[in-house]
């Protein structure tokens, strides 16, 4: 949503900040004054009075370069009556309210003209196409049919399922099956998937972006293609945006904003961003949600839940917890369209970095925000990957790259609250080389106990102890403790040996390490939580940005002080209470083993007695021969279905040409049934092939 904000740094370069005495929710208040309005707007907005009091909060610096004070919403009191119970005076959009000076004397501000010769806003942003309200995608219509939307969703799912089936079926390749042919066909399917997702709109665009972080669930070709997914759709009309803002905030645009730029500066599937100016001169951005989005999410997620439940029951989709994955995605999607939640995230993120002067977070204007409308401080900057603009301003790109990684390490290791989508569109650079963060709809939180387990995992990796690594992964619910885990232990040990035995010049990138982790998970019972994948993805993205900014960039050098701090902390803990706890735990384990020893000896004696008496029977089955025979039977049935289906198809064509439409239709239906049976047979063959690879 904030992708174009970063390109606006030059808009205010020579403009002088204007100091006004109009109403200011974040400006310095020297006077206690009241404002009255009688503008009637539907049932939501009646006559009201806004009363402001002098703030005692610490001063901060606003975007206009002047000292401001943050006034909480509790300082704003709305009343229907006048100051003394009398009717209030009316204002239009350009009017300023009546006020009282510091001595209590009443003073009236003169109504401003409706049109000014000089605007507070910079020139409009080009390149954002506005979609008229009566055109566009089917999902953009607020009155779309729920039934038609469900049909569109299921048509997409069935088409994707058929494509994947043919991609994975060896018999579907002309001239024989090869891995290169399969990869090429998968790339074509992935490209089709990306375009289809864009056509289906907001729900599927966001799900596609989430899926691009899950290399542990989806083929590499799909992940690579979905990572290119750009959330760019035409903006909806300014008239619709203004009506929506007025309905959500309960007052006309002109009462809330001194100026409101109709042309959006950014547009995405979930909404769009407009620039505006408050009556006190503060420049802000207004994030407006696309109308009807909640209804669309409800319909799509209801259908996707049915699909997830089908995947969960089907053996052909593996042992992944598809219902759990669906629930994670649904939670993330609903959080993204809750702008109150996003505002809270922004405030919390701002507090976390309040003592770090090289990180900037836009201020939230709570009195101009609601569930579907969010007003933020306008903080323009240079897009972090715009190398030409960075060079033109003489910025130190190496320092910027290091700061981007360091800020994320602080989020993961110290605050536990991190930005889950730090792509270049959500990161910009201020004039003092500070990093500006945008868009706080998708955030992640690492709870205290989870952070402790992650630290234990880090220590286990450092010690190259595969057994401890596995136990920590089980504690993190990233590894399912089912069956024999000896193969998992060997895979983990191999990964540790390769990771830690390299020289500094041979260190893998974070993206390569992440790919190795997810490659292991393809054949092992791993189930990485979404938080884990978000962290890996974010670090990979930031590392890529680091290499773009500075070819000599090294993640290891930036992270080394933090890693050393963690190791020092571990050593201090080992010398204290943790050492006592470990000794006590080992003593408990030894006592349990000693107490269970007689039972184990008894079981061994019983086994030996059965073996001596001949009561122990061993049953051996030739499994390979059985599987081969079963596969041959399935292929024979598939061949028979194909012949019968082809015969009925020919009969149908013949009778159709002769005018016997009833017989022809029956033949076509029969041919379709046999074709479905053929597909079912091929699916069973694929299951057998996968089973053979697992043993």
UniProtKB/Swiss-Prot annotation:
Tissues with expression: Mostly expressed in leaves and flowers, and, to a lower extent, in roots.
UniProt keyword annotation of Plastid present: yes
Protein keywords: ATP-binding, Chloroplast, Kinase, Lipid metabolism, Membrane, Nucleotide-binding, Plastid, Stress response, Thylakoid, Transferase, Transit peptide, Transmembrane, Transmembrane helix
EC number: 2.7.11.1
Top EC group: transferase
Compartment(s): Plastid, Chloroplast thylakoid membrane; Plastid, Chloroplast, Plastoglobule
Transmembrane segments: 633-653, 659-679
Family annotation (CDD domains): ABC1_ADCK3-like (cd05121)
Induction and repression of expression: Down-regulated in response to iron deprivation.
Catalytic reaction annotation: L-seryl-[protein] + ATP = O-phospho-L-seryl-[protein] + ADP + H(+); L-threonyl-[protein] + ATP = O-phospho-L-threonyl-[protein] + ADP + H(+)
Name used for this protein in its record: Protein ACTIVITY OF BC1 COMPLEX KINASE 7, chloroplastic
Top-level taxonomy: Eukaryota, Viridiplantae, Streptophyta, Embryophyta, Tracheophyta
